[in-house]
């Protein structure tokens, strides 16, 4: 992926310098896990029940957009179960032996966390199925006619799989998870709580309005909120007395080109191109990519999802259309009623 995409300030994917920082502010207990009330309540019940029965927790699938706390929840599950945690990711497991090495080193009730589980090699999945269902590992010894299969018993364990692309999971793998949790984007009050908690851990002085200003521009994502907090902290220490209030947060985020709706330069460039160069659309993805000098995949996977979710653009069979919200955001007059009606007649054909 393009370096400028990876280091995008309001990008939800983890950046190279962030794992240690995220660990330092990651909650360890469900009681400290902010937001996702339904998920938190359900997991509390499931964990308590499994603990009372002295059983391993059912296998858990966690899915949702990046930056919402899937890894954090996996760590909390292990901590609440008073179990060990082994962590890996789908692309890392290249051979069946890689998975076998992990499984045979698990202790009873341990948690095996596989991030990006949708990227598992199909051959790895085949090895995983009996391990999940029967806590057994089938290993092939030897090659050719002399090859034979032996079964190894595994201790009862919990697989926690995390993915941003649940639709890419194969049905056999998806069906083996007894617990499936979807993480939603966070509400502003929850993000304010998250910002204030992180500020306390980082010894940053921040008031309610300062936390609110950061939360409103965080695109519903805790990882982005924590990243913006660190950048606003830098600004406050250099340009102010180190304390973050609403005006300091606003000035810092404006300087960083993150506007009140969490849009950055790339978002605004795409939206303004649709409005000014293509009269609000519809415009095909290839034409749009050429107009803003970005790859099609970058637009579809990185820029568009948040804009579609927030209602700034619509995808139709004839192309992308800027909505009324986009015109309002840029304080631009709406197109003529006939043009607007023609565009919005496509609403019934949204992809």
Curated annotation (Swiss-Prot):
GO biological process, alphabetically ordered: DNA recombination; DNA repair
Catalytic reaction(s) noted: ATP + H2O = ADP + phosphate + H(+)
Major subcellular location class: cytoplasm
Pfam families: AAA_lid_4, RuvB_C, RuvB_N
Region (Head domain (RuvB-H)): 260-351
Small ATPAse domain (RuvB-S): annotated segments: 187-257
Gene3D superfamilies assigned: 1.10.8.60, P-loop containing nucleotide triphosphate hydrolases, Winged helix-like DNA-binding domain superfamily/Winged helix DNA-binding domain
UniProt subcellular location: Cytoplasm
Keyword Protein transport: no
Keywords carried by this UniProt record: ATP-binding, Cytoplasm, DNA damage, DNA recombination, DNA repair, DNA-binding, Hydrolase, Nucleotide-binding
The organism's place on the tree of life at top rank: Bacteria
Binding-site residues, Mg(2+): 71
Enzyme Commission number, as recorded: 3.6.4.-
Residue numbers binding ATP: 25-26, 67, 70-72, 133-135, 176, 186, 223
GO molecular function, a single term: four-way junction DNA binding
Region (Large ATPase domain (RuvB-L)): 1-186
Cellular component annotations (GO), alphabetically ordered: cytoplasm; Holliday junction resolvase complex
InterPro entries hit by this protein: AAA+_ATPase, AAA_lid_4, DNA_helicase_Holl-junc_RuvB, P-loop_NTPase, RuvB-like_N, RuvB_C, WH-like_DNA-bd_sf, WH_DNA-bd_sf
Residues binding DNA, per UniProt: 296, 315, 320
PANTHER family: HOLLIDAY JUNCTION BRANCH MIGRATION COMPLEX SUBUNIT RUVB, PTHR42848
Family membership: Belongs to the RuvB family.
Function of the protein: The RuvA-RuvB-RuvC complex processes Holliday junction (HJ) DNA during genetic recombination and DNA repair, while the RuvA-RuvB complex plays an important role in the rescue of blocked DNA replication forks via replication fork reversal (RFR). RuvA specifically binds to HJ cruciform DNA, conferring on it an open structure. The RuvB hexamer acts as an ATP-dependent pump, pulling dsDNA into and through the RuvAB complex. RuvB forms 2 homohexamers on either side of HJ DNA bound by 1 or 2 RuvA tetramers; 4 subunits per hexamer contact DNA at a time.
UniProt comment concerning the protein's domains: Has 3 domains, the large (RuvB-L) and small ATPase (RuvB-S) domains and the C-terminal head (RuvB-H) domain. The head domain binds DNA, while the ATPase domains jointly bind ATP, ADP or are empty depending on the state of the subunit in the translocation cycle. During a single DNA translocation step the structure of each domain remains the same, but their relative positions change.
Subunit structure and binding partners: Homohexamer. Forms an RuvA(8)-RuvB(12)-Holliday junction (HJ) complex. HJ DNA is sandwiched between 2 RuvA tetramers; dsDNA enters through RuvA and exits via RuvB. An RuvB hexamer assembles on each DNA strand where it exits the tetramer. Each RuvB hexamer is contacted by two RuvA subunits (via domain III) on 2 adjacent RuvB subunits; this complex drives branch migration. In the full resolvosome a probable DNA-RuvA(4)-RuvB(12)-RuvC(2) complex forms which resolves the HJ.
Protein name: Holliday junction branch migration complex subunit RuvB
Organism: Coxiella burnetii (strain RSA 493 / Nine Mile phase I)
Gene name of this polypeptide: ruvB
